[in-house]
């Protein structure tokens, strides 16, 4: 990505996101302005998770992974992430570390807690937490993001890396490509 001047204030980045979301919703009404703003909050979070590029062992799954491939797919309420090679607690610690990455965009993601969410007899090869982060732009709380974090049985097909198809047109924000859980494996899990 070419060097661009970042937004100088939290209000500036917030206004740019709102304007881009309105324009995008006018062009494609499958998602409304508020859903697109929330999607940008997801992207700000995921740009931190995938900030290590090809070195990353994180994979995006679920509805957010679908939106990254097909921009007019249904809106989703959470982010599904898979981490290879870590225990669940190690993955949680790594997620918290990555969420604190400063991308110069005035966003901050504050860990708010987690609870056991998957595993046990129903899913013996997978362990997971439902993790909550508070979203801040500057010092103002804006939203809450829930992440379904999973470790365990990994994908059997090739991982793809791509820019999110649902991204808003915000060239002054640092964005990192997502590593996407294979579609065939995602379907098999359902």
Language model features with spans:
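Compositionally biased terminal segments of proteins
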Residues: 1-190
């Amino acid at each position: 990505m070419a060097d661009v001047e970042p937004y100088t204030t939290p209000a500036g980045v917030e206004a740019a996101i709102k304007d881009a979301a309105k324009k995008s919703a006018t062009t494609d009404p499958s998602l409304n302005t508020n859903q697109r703003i929330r999607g940008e909050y997801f992207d700000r979070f995921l740009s931190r998770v995938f900030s290590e590029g090809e070195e990353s062992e994180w994979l995006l799954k679920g509805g957010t992974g679908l939106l990254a491939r097909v921009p007019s797919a249904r809106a989703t309420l959470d982010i599904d992430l898979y981490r290879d090679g870590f225990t669940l607690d190690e993955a949680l610690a790594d997620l918290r570390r990555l969420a604190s990455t400063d991308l110069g965009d005035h966003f901050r993601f504050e860990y708010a807690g987690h609870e056991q969410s998957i595993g046990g007899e129903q899913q013996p090869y997978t362990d997971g937490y439902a993790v909550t982060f508070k979203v801040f732009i500057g010092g103002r709380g804006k939203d809450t993001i829930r992440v379904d974090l999973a470790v365990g049985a990994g994908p059997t097909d090739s991982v793809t890396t791509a820019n999110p198809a649902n991204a808003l047109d915000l060239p002054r924000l640092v964005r990192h490509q997502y590593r996407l859980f294979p579609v065939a494996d995602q379907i098999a899990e359902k």
